[in-house]
Amino acid sequence: MHMIAGLLAGFPNFLLYFSVSIIFVLAFKFIYVKLTPYDEWRLIKEKQNTAAAVALSGAFLGYCIAISGAAKNSVNIVDFMVWGVVAMLAQIIAFAIVRFILLPRVTERIEKDELPAGIVLAAVSISVGILNAACMTY
């Protein structure tokens, strides 16, 4: 019985961090798709645009990797929330770097369903998420 009680002792914190994580992912989805010049959901749903699906999936994965690092290394929920916002900003900056520096026509290429552009954007997003998660230490 003590073992079960010990296992359940961390459950409230799990629920708190997991709930905040889901809220952050939903907020990220809302903000990220508003900042991109194309409508990912329309491209994916109506046009079966693979490049848009890959790019958006990479952005989600990169953000989730980063907030998982924040959850692991945060000292409390407020700390986690601050790092969640930092991770979101890092993903938005990563998109801007790809769009304006690395691959200036990336948005047009994704709209045309050019898969290599979606892969590059996804790879940068995931890479930034991994770096972000690794740097969130004390």
Residue ranges and their predicted role:
Residues 6-24, 76-90:
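Alpha-helical transmembrane segments
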Residues 21-29, 90-95, 125-129:
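Alpha-helical transmembrane segments of multipass membrane proteins
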Residues 91-107:
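Transmembrane alpha-helical segments of integral membrane proteins
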Residues 104-125:
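Interfacial loop-to-transmembrane junctions
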